[in-house]
Design a protein with these regions (language model features):
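A short, hydrophobic C-terminal helix/tail in secreted or cell-surface proteins
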Residues: 183-187
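FabD-like malonyl-/acyl-CoA
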Residues: 1-111
Length: 187
């Protein structure tokens, strides 16, 4: 497919035939999620369901922008593949984790994160009222989870991720991605 050629990887093979360890590497997960998102949008269009507007969170922004024809498949394939590589390769070494805190006010979750003394935990995504994703290292997320439950969270769900996404730990990856996309726009 066009997306696979642009990314330099057989996305269908990666998604359906690779081992979990390979697919869960950020450099592979990013492009696989993009392909699935775009595939779902294509299926909806085939059923005559077309959005007037599209938006996305984090990686979802790339699918939304492609759906809106702001990116070509060639461009988004290259960009998202590089983005995943930057995220994986420029993340500092660490034992990272994320969790979703459910049933607690945003401000309370922020207070809970400030109480963490073993490692770090910070609110990463305010997903919807009553649900916030928190990123950090495993020790910080474990401590945050215990405090959140003690202070009234309905649930804390561990998220299967390889990094503390949406935190300052990915600043270098963000800078590299910005430079890459700026250079691509100049070409």
């Amino acid at each position: 497919s066009t997306l696979s050629k642009a990314a330099g990887i057989d996305i269908a093979d990666l998604t359906f035939n690779s081992q979990e360890e390979e697919l869960s590497q950020t450099k592979n997960t990013q492009i696989a999620i993009l392909a699935m998102s775009l595939g779902i949008l294509k299926l909806l269009e085939e059923k005559n369901i077309k959005a007037d507007y599209a938006t996305g969170l984090s990686l979802g922004e790339y699918a939304a922008l492609t759906y809106a024809k702001s990116f070509t498949l060639e461009d988004v394939g290259k960009i998202v593949k590089k983005r995943g590589e930057f995220m994986q390769n420029l993340l500092p070494e660490g034992d990272w984790a994320m969790a979703a805190v459910i049933g607690m006010e945003d401000e309370k979750i922020e207070e809970v994160c400030k109480k963490v003394v073993q490692g770090f935990a910070v609110p990463a995504n305010y997903n919807c009222p009553g649900q916030v994703a928190v990123s950090g290292d495993k020790a910080g997320i474990l401590e945050m989870s215990e405090i959140a439950k003690e202070e009234g969270a309905k649930r804390v769900v561990s998220l299967k991720t390889s990094g503390p996404f949406h935190t300052e730990k990915l600043v270098e990856a963000s800078k590299a991605c910005l430079l890459y996309t700026s250079d691509a726009a100049d070409d």
